């Protein structure tokens, strides 16, 4: 990913609460609404998906905007996320498939610009600052982005909801290109 910190921040997000809700309370609120969200960092973009019941879309947009705007750092959650990432790397070293397709193939295709080389070192992971990662999350809406809607509601109703709840600056930043 073009921004290593952003990629780590979106992994960390699911373990964070806000100024009003703990991480568990957020999951419970989403469950009550029949909604789920997922955030994933791909090569050049961050994908955010809010899915579930159409009748809960307004509350879901409000809640997700609250999460992004009011997320709070959690040192323990970051330490656990880092430990998970380090364990994942150790496990990958034991997998021939991961070595061949995740490492050698990528290096063969991209050389020095291989995604395998554009990752945090162990020391960098351990020294990540939770406040810096939370700041990245809070700035997600300030980058160029698209909103896609699939559902039964009228598109004008969705536009109205987004205009009402989706807070963005007047001028959006360009997406950071992948290396």
Each language-model region and where it sits:
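M16 family metallopeptidases and their MPP-like homologs
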Residues: 1-14, 18-70, 82-90, 95-124, ...
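Short beta-strands and strand-coil junctions in structured, solvent-facing domains, enriched
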Residues: 69-70, 74-75, 155-156
